[in-house]
């Protein structure tokens, strides 16, 4: 016969086991939740575990800033820069300034306690130091494969902030514009890209930081430019005249970085440049210098760049 005391003891044991099971399940759920709240990001300097939907985000890369702006993602800290009109709101005082385009302010960054830091080429050497403050990813674009690199970076941002569907929608629309521009480029002859700075000129070709015109949009290069990496080839007016491009695209670096210097239009105002097919057919296009030199591969900015080239052809 089962006594009352034994029955009570058994009931207590069952309750204890049930409570233990619930606690274990809750703990497992907490672990799974914690695991789901982070993800591993492969980037230019390795792989980094980053939070999903980080609350406080700092970026030195204006292309990433432009992409996050296009996706309606809040950004809390940016470098002091000469922002183009499309990103001028980030120059406001309430947005934390985390240094310059090339030099991080480590004290300000540490004080802000960011959950994620995004960098690219200009501050790539500071990756290790920044990684000590917060998870840091390097979204530098690979100029040798700029389009796919840009897409991968954009998709990475989409995954971090759970905006994958919106990213694919915007990339799809952009790819349609690229195809339309390539059709125009097929019959547009050739082109040369020149940047002016301090009265000097540098040419950029396929595979360069501005190579989207050739590599992605399909305009034939007017010359084989010998520049390496981020740096183009120093050229003269005679070079431009001898190359004789059908289209000439011009970037004024002095305007982009906010320094005084002879305007690109004045630099190119000479008889040698005027003798080119580009000048004679009014096919010299002055590019938005901040957009092309400072921002580059951002989701909205690439759309603007593609539209500019499309209209020029």
Segments from the language model and where they lie:
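Bacterial Sec-exported substrate-binding components of ABC uptake systems
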Residues: 2-62, 165-192, 254-264, 287-290, ...
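Extracytoplasmic substrate-binding proteins
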Residues: 129-198, 295-313
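Structured C-terminal subdomain patch of bacterial secreted/periplasmic proteins
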Residues: 246-313
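Alpha-helical, coiled-coil/dimerization segments enriched in small aliphatic residues
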Residues: 83-86, 205-233, 289
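A short, structured surface patch at a secondary-structure boundary
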Residues: 56-111
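Ligand-binding pocket segment of bilobal, Venus flytrap-like solute-binding proteins
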Residues: 196-198, 202, 229-257
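Proline-aspartate-enriched helix->loop->beta-strand connector
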Residues: 113-119, 135, 240, 244-248
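Short helix-initiation/N-cap motifs at beta->coil->alpha
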Residues: 43-45, 98-105, 227-236
């Amino acid at each position: 016969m089962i006594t009352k005391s034994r029955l009570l003891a058994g009931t207590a044991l069952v309750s204890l086991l049930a409570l233990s099971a619930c606690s274990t399940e809750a703990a497992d759920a907490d672990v799974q939740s914690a695991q789901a709240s982070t993800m591993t990001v492969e980037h230019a300097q390795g792989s980094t575990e980053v939070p999903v939907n980080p609350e406080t985000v700092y970026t030195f890369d204006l292309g990433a800033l432009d992409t996050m702006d296009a996706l309606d993602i809040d950004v809390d800290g940016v470098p002091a820069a000469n922002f183009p009109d499309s990103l001028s709101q980030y120059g406001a005082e309430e947005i934390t300034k985390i240094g310059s385009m090339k030099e991080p302010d480590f004290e300000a960054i540490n004080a802000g306690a960011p959950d994620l830091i995004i960098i690219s080429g200009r501050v790539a050497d500071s990756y290790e130091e920044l990684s000590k403050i917060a998870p840091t990813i390097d979204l530098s674009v690979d100029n040798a494969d700029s389009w796919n690199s840009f897409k991968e970076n954009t998709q990475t941002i989409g995954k971090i902030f759970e905006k994958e569907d919106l990213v694919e929608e915007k990339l799809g629309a952009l790819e349609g514009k690229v195809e339309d521009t390539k059709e125009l480029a097929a019959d547009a002859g050739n082109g040369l890209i020149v940047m002016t700075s301090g009265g000097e000129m540098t040419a950029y070709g396929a595979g360069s930081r501005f190579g989207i015109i050739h590599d992605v949009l399909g305009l034939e290069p007017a010359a084989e430019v010998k520049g390496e990496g981020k740096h183009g080839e120093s050229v003269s007016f005679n070079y431009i005249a001898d190359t004789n491009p059908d289209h000439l695209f011009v970037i004024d670096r002095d305007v982009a970085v906010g320094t005084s210097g002879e305007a690109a239009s004045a630099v190119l105002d000479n008889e040698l440049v005027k003798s080119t097919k580009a000048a004679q057919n009014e096919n010299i296009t002055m590019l938005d210098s901040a957009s092309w030199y400072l921002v580059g591969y951002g989701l909205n900015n690439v759309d603007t760049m593609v539209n500019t080239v499309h209209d020029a052809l």
